[in-house]
């Protein structure tokens, strides 16, 4: 992290992972713990939403954010988007809770029993030790991240083609996608209007391409260190890597917000409510186009706006850490502004 030439800087508890940015073993433990918390929330909140779900009220009007995703994946859904069985949701919630326990145990192991720094260990674990100024090792770790993202994209393809299918909002039934679109011109054509996709064949075909590209990129980064031009262009430091990550999350959040707001194939009206419209107040926001009872908001409104505002703050984090990475000292800016004020 940026220390401004102070090698003895001490981070308090609120600094998060910065406290052990140079301890690769504890750094892994922190990430595993964060994964455990994420899966714990997903499992527990799925069960909570099951307890609140009312079959007689449209799902999109109940303020649910997880069950609509599971229904879109074809779990427990019958004709016309009717939820006929909530037991699959219970099982999925349980699997997430069990996974969180396993991940939590892994986090505790890495925190209390594992080596604090993988540099001091032996065997295959040592190859995951990294230094923030080592482009080759950072590329290796990036490659493994891309492999997992690619496999996740292909899991959706597997669900669509082999494991029960997806809910098709155009026909209002769960169906298997037998012939996904593989024409690269069709898939690439969505670059300028990705949110207009209106058939499962194109949606699944896009995931095939994305999954394969991610896996290909992962293999590339594992076996090949960054090219000379990348080493010259990019800054390799903890602060810079954090800024790149936050920027990527911000971009994904903005894309997800818009996609959720307007697309009714990946986000069916039956589960999320009607499409939204963009409005402007103190800030831009997405508003329901259908008035709900008791002044409530649709699941689509909750998700789109949450993604938008979270993405906005991730973008601020990206800019903050990017500026710090290139050497901007915000303390000096404050001193300069105070000096100007005093002079006046």
Swiss-Prot record:
One of its GO terms (cellular component) is plasma membrane-derived thylakoid membrane. Induction: By iron stress. One of its GO terms (biological process) is photosynthetic electron transport chain. One of its GO terms (molecular function) is chlorophyll binding. Keywords: Chlorophyll, Chromophore, Membrane, Photosynthesis, Photosystem I, Stress response, Thylakoid, Transmembrane, Transmembrane helix. Its main location: membrane. It is a multi-pass membrane protein. Under iron-starvation forms a complex with PSI trimers, where the trimer is surrounded by a ring composed of 18 IsiA subunits. This is Iron stress-induced chlorophyll-binding protein.
């Amino acid at each position: 992290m940026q220390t401004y030439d102070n090698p003895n800087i001490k981070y308090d508890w609120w600094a998060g992972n910065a406290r052990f940015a140079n301890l690769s073993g504890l750094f892994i433990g922190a990430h595993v713990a964060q994964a455990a918390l994420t899966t714990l929330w997903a499992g527990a909140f799925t069960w909570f939403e099951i307890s609140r779900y009312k079959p007689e009220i449209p799902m999109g009007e109940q303020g649910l954010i997880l069950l609509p995703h599971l229904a879109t994946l074809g779990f427990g859904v019958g004709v016309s988007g009717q939820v006929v069985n909530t037991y699959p949701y219970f099982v999925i919630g349980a699997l997430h809770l069990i996974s969180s326990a396993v991940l939590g145990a892994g986090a505790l192991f890495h925190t209390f029993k594992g080596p604090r720094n993988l540099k001091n260990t032996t065997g295959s674990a040592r190859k995951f030790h990294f230094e923030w100024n080592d482009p080759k090792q950072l590329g290796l770790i990036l490659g493994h991240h891309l492999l997992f993202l690619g496999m996740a994209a292909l899991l959706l393809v597997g669900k669509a083609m082999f494991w029960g299918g997806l809910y098709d909002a155009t026909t209002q039934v769960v169906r298997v996608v037998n012939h996904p679109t593989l024409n690269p011109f069709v898939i690439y054509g969505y670059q300028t209007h990705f949110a207009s996709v209106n058939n499962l064949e194109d949606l699944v075909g896009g995931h095939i391409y994305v999954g394969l590209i991610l896996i290909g990129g992962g293999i590339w980064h594992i076996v090949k260190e960054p090219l000379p031009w990348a080493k010259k262009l990019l800054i390799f430091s903890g602060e810079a890597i954090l800024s790149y990550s936050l920027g990527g999350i911000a971009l994904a959040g903005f894309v997800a917000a818009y996609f959720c707001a307007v697309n009714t194939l990946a986000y069916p009206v039956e589960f999320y409510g009607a499409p939204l419209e963009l409005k402007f107040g103190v800030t831009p926001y997405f508003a329901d186009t259908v008035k709900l009872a008791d002044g409530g908001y649709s699941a689509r409104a909750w998700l789109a706006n949450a993604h938008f505002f979270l993405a906005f703050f991730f973008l601020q984090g990206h800019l903050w850490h990017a500026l710090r990475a290139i050497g901007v000292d915000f303390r000096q800016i404050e001193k300069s502004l105070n000096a100007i004020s005093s002079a006046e």
